């Protein structure tokens, strides 16, 4: 199965013939495998570990914040996060030779129309197709942009975080300020947490870092699927002189061992749609990753049907804190 964006690209396969091709951005389907026989080589640069985990062994894939490879043709799948797009495209073009050919594809609702404005200063760009509610643009590089990783780092502090300084890169959830859901969840974190703690879907590492700050004996593991989140969490730990393990995992896919506390502000947005797969997987499998008597604690929008899921898999739940928009739920394994 291929996405709407890839269906549009399929109409232009002669542009791929006998070329080395790099697919980047929000690519998340089987299109790379479909075009392998027509291209000299196909490689993927993805920031999303759930996709990387799914296609590993089928396609050459690079899961990293920084990518230094080159290709005759770059195919960029536009994402809804404009800062993320700018980070990736500027990095790719700074590393590319003058004359580099780029195809940019995206759903209209994701904001792909802004591609022309973003790239006009660096070369020739024009729309070559419009179908499936998507726009396809062809770009030729004439002037390489400047790209400095350090310019993209953001930091912030918050009264609720004490001395903690949060470091984040574009595309990371709550990258510029402490979100209200995490704030409510942290209000339930005291200095009595011991043992092994898993911060699942860690973003910039705020929750796990605060637990470590308040509970130095706790052994904290942080996971996420997003490469930028993992890099941000690692730096947040490092700059605050805190210890912890940071690893890529699609929910529990690469998590080993059992935990005294699994804590999360789980994502419920997938691209530009709302999705519950990860949350259902988190709740349905958490029991197998908790020690006897271990706790799963999550914060969620009050309108989401998580209480039903928690009751289904744990036989009940407690509400530790709530506002008119958010609730913190707790269940014991």
UniProtKB/Swiss-Prot annotation:
Transmembrane keyword on record: no
- As recorded in UniProt, coiled-coil segments are none
Q: Which SUPFAM superfamilies match?
A: S-adenosyl-L-methionine-dependent methyltransferases
Per the record, GO CC terms?
A: cytoplasm
> Where's it mainly located?
cytoplasm
Name the EC number(s).
Answer: 2.1.1.172
> What compartments host this protein?
Cytoplasm
| Keyword field | Cytoplasm, Methyltransferase, rRNA processing, S-adenosyl-L-methionine, Transferase
| InterPro entries to which the protein is assigned, alphabetical | DNA_methylase_N6_adenine_CS (IPR002052), Mtase_sm_N (IPR013675), rRNA_ssu_MeTfrase_C (IPR023543), RsmC/RlmG (IPR046977), SAM-dependent_MTases_sf (IPR029063), Small_mtfrase_dom (IPR007848)
- Membership in a protein family: Belongs to the methyltransferase superfamily. RsmC family.
**General function of this protein:** Specifically methylates the guanine in position 1207 of 16S rRNA in the 30S particle.
Summary of subunit composition and partner proteins:
Monomer.
- This chain belongs to the protein called Ribosomal RNA small subunit methyltransferase C
Q: Which organism is it from?
A: Mannheimia succiniciproducens (strain KCTC 0769BP / MBEL55E)
Gene for this chain: rsmC
């Amino acid at each position: 199965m291929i996405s709407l964006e890839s269906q549009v690209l399929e109409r232009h396969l002669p542009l791929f013939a006998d070329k080395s091709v790099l697919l980047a951005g929000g690519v998340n389907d089987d299109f790379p495998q479909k075009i392998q026989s027509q291209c000299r080589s196909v490689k993927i640069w993805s920031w999303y570990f759930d996709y990387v985990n799914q296609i590993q062994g089928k396609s050459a894939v690079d899961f990293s914040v920084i990518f230094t490879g080159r290709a005759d043709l770059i195919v960029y799948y536009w994402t809804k996060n404009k800062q993320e797009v700018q980070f990736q495209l500027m990095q790719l073009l700074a590393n590319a030779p003058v004359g580099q050919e780029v195809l940019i594809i995206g759903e209209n609702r994701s904001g792909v129309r802004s591609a022309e404005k973003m790239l006009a200063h660096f070369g020739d760009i024009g729309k070559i197709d419009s179908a499936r509610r998507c726009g396809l643009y062809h770009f030729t590089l004439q002037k390489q942009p400047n790209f400095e990783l350090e310019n993209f780092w953001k930091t912030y502090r918050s009264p609720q975080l004490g001395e903690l300084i949060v470091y984040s890169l574009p595309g990371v959830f709550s990258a510029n300020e402490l979100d209200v859901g995490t704030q409510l969840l942290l209000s339930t974190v005291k200095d009595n947490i011991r043992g092994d703690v898993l911060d699942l879907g860690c973003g910039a590492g705020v929750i796990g870092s605060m637990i470590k700050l308040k509970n130095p004996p706790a052994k904290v593991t942080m996971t996420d699927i997003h490469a930028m989140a993992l890099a941000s969490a690692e730096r947040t730990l490092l700059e605050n002189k805190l210890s912890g393990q940071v690893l890529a995992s699609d929910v529990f896919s690469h998590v080993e061992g059992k935990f005294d506390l699994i804590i999360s502000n789980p994502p419920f947005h997938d691209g530009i749609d709302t999705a519950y797969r990860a949350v259902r997987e988190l709740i349905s499998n958490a029991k197998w990753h908790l020690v006897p008597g271990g706790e799963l604690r999550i914060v969620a929008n009050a309108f989401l049907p998580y209480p039903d899921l928690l009751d289904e898999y744990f036989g009940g739940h407690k509400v530790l804190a709530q506002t008119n928009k958010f609730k913190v739920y707790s269940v014991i394994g």
